[in-house]
Every structure is written in C-alpha cells, then in structure tokens.
From Swiss-Prot:
Catalyzes the methylthiolation of N6-(dimethylallyl)adenosine (i(6)A), leading to the formation of 2-methylthio-N6-(dimethylallyl)adenosine (ms(2)i(6)A) at position 37 in tRNAs that read codons beginning with uridine. It comes from Trichlorobacter lovleyi (strain ATCC BAA-1151 / DSM 17278 / SZ). NCBIfam families: miaB-methiolase (TIGR01574), MiaB/RimO family radical SAM methylthiotransferase (TIGR00089). [4Fe-4S] cluster 1 binds at C13, C49, C83. This is tRNA-2-methylthio-N(6)-dimethylallyladenosine synthase. The gene is miaB.
Amino acid sequence: MNHKKLYIDTVGCQMNVNDSERIVTMLQPLGYTQTSRRHEAALILFNTCTVRAGAEECLLQNIANLKNLKRKKPGTLIGVAGCVAQQMGAELLQKFPWVDLVFGTHNLHLVPEMVKDAEAGRRRAETDFLDSSERLDLFPPIEGRKRVSAFVTVMQGCDNFCSYCIVPYVRGREISRRFAEILQEVQDLAAQGLREVVLLGQNVNSYGLKGEEQPSFAELVRAVAAVSGIDRVRFVTSHPKDMSDDLIACFADLAKLCGSLHLPAQAGNNRILKAMNRGYSREHYLETIYKLRQARPEIKITGDMIVGFPGETEAEFEETLSLMEEVRYFDLFSFVYSPRPGTKAAELSDELAKEVKLARLDRLQKLQAVHSRIHNETYVGSTQQVLVEGLAKRHGQVSGRCDSGRIVNLAGSPALIGKLVDVKILEGYANSLLGELL
C-alpha cells in the first residue's frame, strides 16, 4: 500500500476533535497516516468552527496562505470540513481554486470517496443534511485509539436555537444515538485498556428527550459507569434547562462520575438570557448549582460567558459579574459577542461599541483569574488521584488529570501512563498543578 501523510488542523469544540479522529480512521484503508508536520502531508484538512467570526476569518486566511504551496506541490490535496464547510459549501471551491474537497457535518461517511475523487483530479463539495434515520447509522468506530481517555458521541445536533448561535444551522437537529450501540463502544474501549470515557454531544444532557424510545441521559450515565474497566466517566456539554434531578443524583451516587461539570450560563441577567433564548432564568441556574453542590459538595463548575450581547447595559453586565461571584467558577471560557449571519441576534440593531465589549471582557476575565487562582491554591498540600495520560512538555515529567479535570504534571516515567496514582500537590499555577508521586 502506498503510504501517504494526512495533516488535520482541528479547531472548535470537542465534537470536531471527535470527528477528526473518525476521519483519520476512515482514511487509513486509503493508505493515509496522520502527521503533525504539515509540510510532509499529501492531504491537508481543516476541520473548522464558525461559532465566532474570528475562527472563520482565521480559517479563510490559512487557506489563502496555501496558494503558493499548491503551486509548488500541485499534488498536495487540500480539504475543508466542519461548520465553515457546512455553511459555505461549494463557495469555498469557487473562492479558492486550490481547494480540492469540502464536506459538511453530515457528510463524514463520504470522505474516502471524496478523497479518491480528489486524487483523480475531481473537485467536490458535499453539504447535504441527512434525515435522522440515515444519521443513526453514521457513527463509525474510531480505531487505533492508544490514549487513556476517549470521547464517545451519544448525540449530535441542537434544537435550542439560542438567538446568537449558529450551531443548529450547521450541525442540524438533535438526534440521540442508540443506547445499546453506545454501551458496546464503551465496552470495546474498556477491553482496549482505556480508563476514562467522556460522553459527548452538542447538548449532551438532552439525550433521549426528543420522543425517541431511549432511556434518559441519567440512565445512560449509570449504565456507562457500570462498565467494568472504566474508572472515570465525564460528559460535556450540558444545557442548564436539561439538568434533571435524576442526572444531578448521579453525582451523589456514582463514584466513577468525575466531580466536574461544564454548565454554560452565558449571562447573569434575566432580560439578556431571554433575549438569548436560553430557556432558563438566573434563579433557575443558581438553584441547579445549589442542587449539584448538595449532591457533590466538592464539584467543580466550569462555564461560558458572552460579553456585550446587543443592548446589554452596564447594570446587566454587573449581574453577570455577580453571578460569577455566587458560582465561583473553577474555569470560565469568555468571549465578546460575535454576530453570526442567519441568527436572530444578528438582526438586532443595538450592538455595543467594540471598545465597550472589550473593556467588559477584560473586567470579567480579571475576576475569573482571581477565582481560578483561589481554586488552585486550595489544592496545594492535598492528595489527588491522578489518571496519567501521557508525557508532559518538560523532560522527565508525565501529565494527567485529577477528578476535577485540572492538569497535573509530576516527575515520572512513561510506565505510569494509564495508571491512577496518588499525587501530593506542591504548587498551583494558572491552568495546571505540580505534584509528586506518593
């Protein structure tokens, strides 16, 4: 077999990471192996995100920069996948004549065929959405996973249509994967020696809510936690309105379910939340946090915040800061509002000045830096169970995660990879911890 190199530049959410892993698996029969060196690749793929304008602009610039490479190495294939591909489709082929293939979020199953066409000189774009029955059969297994932890897709798409968000338009409507199929994949991963699974979906805790004859997401979490050989279970990303009491009870009942949860609030003011079409109030969100901490007192909450939504007043922004003070997020991903074409919010006329949005983002991030530092300082001197995942950047160290998901680096040999070890935490940094093996 002719061995060829595949380079994938993946940005965006965990679903994109998972899709890239599936693409690697699907192209192996064609002789492609993944490389981290773009210059040696026979096929360069961009798996893209369009949630914010900046990511889309960066992608278009990256493609433009490959014009000279294509001129020097005309045999190199260039492709675009993911949400920008879904949104722009054949327009990318027209705009960039050196791009060979474009495939959307429902078209991963066509990748081998499209690559063969590209190798034969036939350019192609595929962005058709599939119906739910067709999509149910398009969860190909990911082969050759040598890591300690793995994503397992349980649902795709989103039905929430938050006013600022383009995801439902580029990922499609929600569909829940078959319960038995998910459990079989988890059992197969356990048999391969993986120790942790992360249940994945755009709106993971809406699994089974759309009239499908499926168990609830809480029942799925309990079933996955019961699989022998799996030591840790996580799930991402959750929507506050779908955080059921049964699911919250899992944090009290299941030792394998890690004590961390990503629960995006997006804003702290009720008028803004309603304008965003989030489907819950500030009070409901805080009640959910209270219930979670009753179930698992040490649970670490992470979240997302959007700053500068159209019409946001100073007083409304202050309510976001006060929500942060009440929740005390472990980590927070924060962004300036970015209008996306086709969304309801993009039609609003009262967008804030850029300097106002940036100033508010700076204030928010400084507050979160204080909270994150306090969280990290509480670890110093404690003993944490760490699942070692791989080598650290520093020579002689390995890296893993404690129950909260925080990265822990420690001196140790590669023989520790895949093991759960007790570690004493020596120092806390902005985004990681330093420990020593006990």
